């Protein structure tokens, strides 16, 4: 039985971890995940999906704010793991930790060397890519730059958003890891170096990127909305108040960027730099998420054709 240390945080990671837990060839000695966070207006403490799964299986849990130089690092190294598996962990691993195990493998949600970094799924959708994928790769000190063990891809559908693609890639990543790891560990599967000259990056989404730019084309705005749903969520402004936009669809019509060009009891169409979009699901500041018809029956009823949002 191969003894593993698992490192990851979101549901993507938990899906991969569950696959390892269900496989009798591996024993998970411990998991390292991000600290619990206070979320929402009530500041409720939320544990990570990886921690929740570890609790259910009685696995030791380590949650350092920063792994390097921490007491947890010493404790982790004393576990005596054969190898490390990471998936969306969100921290660099200290060299001393990498050197302490026989192998360290990362499950990365992009077709490397494209989209190294923390938000590959967001950028794949926002950039209008036709496919996304997962790469199983060796871990080195440089971010997502290690040799590639295996790859798998899937189409990005017009109906996909970050949430749906996240779920698809988690399953692909889980299966790809379990399929490739035995051959990798036996030496049968030889890793392939990345072409570093082709590397692109997907840094974590900044608050400024969440704001919609209505001068973009309708397709670009549409991709941007999908590439922010369900987190961190794209937004615009209406009368100085933030209006989050979860869902929209391409629509007919032209106008000035951000201009209301159609308004009925159940629809609101906004012009982009080229083309237009019909808003479907929004969330006004301080209100719950709602269908556009409910918004137009309330806060949005003052909007008229010719008015502007995003100003």
UniProtKB/Swiss-Prot annotation:
Give me the Gene Ontology terms describing cellular component: cytosol
Q: Which GO terms describe its molecular function?
A: methionyl-tRNA formyltransferase activity
Which Pfam families does the UniProt entry name for this protein? Answer: Formyl_trans_C, Formyl_trans_N
Q: What UniProt keywords apply to this chain's record, in alphabetical order?
A: Protein biosynthesis, Transferase
Q: Which InterPro entries match?
A: Fmt (IPR005794), Formyl_trans_C (IPR005793), Formyl_trans_C_sf (IPR037022), Formyl_transf_N (IPR002376), Formyl_transf_N_sf (IPR036477), Formyl_transferase-like_C_sf (IPR011034), GART_AS (IPR001555), Met-tRNA-FMT_C (IPR044135)
E.C. number, please?
A: 2.1.2.9
Reactions catalysed: L-methionyl-tRNA(fMet) + (6R)-10-formyltetrahydrofolate = N-formyl-L-methionyl-tRNA(fMet) + (6S)-5,6,7,8-tetrahydrofolate + H(+)
Residues bound to (6S)-5,6,7,8-tetrahydrofolate are 110-113
Tell me its family.
Answer: Belongs to the Fmt family.
Q: Which NCBIfam families match?
A: fmt (TIGR00460)
Q: Function, please?
A: Attaches a formyl group to the free amino group of methionyl-tRNA(fMet). The formyl group appears to play a dual role in the initiator identity of N-formylmethionyl-tRNA by promoting its recognition by IF2 and preventing the misappropriation of this tRNA by the elongation apparatus.
Give the protein name, as stated in the record.
Answer: Methionyl-tRNA formyltransferase
* Organism of this sequence: Streptococcus pyogenes serotype M28 (strain MGAS6180)
């Amino acid at each position: 039985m191969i003894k593993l240390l698992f490192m990851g945080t979101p549901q993507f990671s938990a899906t991969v971890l569950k696959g390892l837990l269900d496989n009798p060839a591996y024993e998970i000695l411990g998991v390292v995940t991000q600290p619990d966070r206070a979320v929402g207006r009530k500041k409720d403490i939320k544990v990570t999906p990886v921690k929740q799964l570890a609790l259910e299986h009685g696995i030791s849990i380590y949650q350092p704010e920063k792994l390097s130089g921490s007491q947890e690092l010493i404790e982790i190294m004393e576990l005596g793991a054969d190898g490390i598996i990471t998936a969306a962990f969100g921290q660099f691993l200290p060299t001393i930790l990498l050197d302490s195990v026989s192998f360290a493998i990362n499950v990365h949600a992009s077709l490397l060397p494209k989209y190294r970094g923390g938000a590959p799924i967001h950028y794949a959708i926002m950039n209008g890519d036709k496919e996304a994928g997962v790469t199983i790769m060796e871990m080195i000190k440089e971010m997502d730059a290690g040799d590639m063990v295996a790859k798998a891809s899937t189409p990005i559908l017009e109906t996909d958003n970050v949430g749906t693609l996240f779920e698809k890639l988690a399953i692909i990543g889980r299966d790809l890891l379990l399929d490739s790891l035995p051959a990798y560990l036996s030496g049968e599967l030889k890793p392939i170096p990345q072409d570093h000259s082709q590397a692109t990056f997907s840094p974590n989404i900044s608050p400024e990127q969440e704001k919609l730019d209505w001068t973009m084309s309708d397709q670009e705005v549409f991709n941007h909305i999908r590439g922010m749903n369900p987190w961190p969520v794209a937004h615009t402004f209406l009368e100085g108040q933030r209006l989050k936009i979860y869902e929209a669809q391409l629509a007919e019509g032209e106008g000035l960027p951000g201009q209301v060009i159609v308004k009925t009891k159940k629809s609101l169409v906004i012009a982009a730099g080229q083309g237009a979009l019909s808003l479907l699901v929004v969330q006004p500041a301080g209100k719950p998420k709602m269908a556009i018809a409910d918004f137009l029956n309330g806060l949005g009823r003052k909007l008229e054709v010719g008015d502007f949002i995003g100003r």
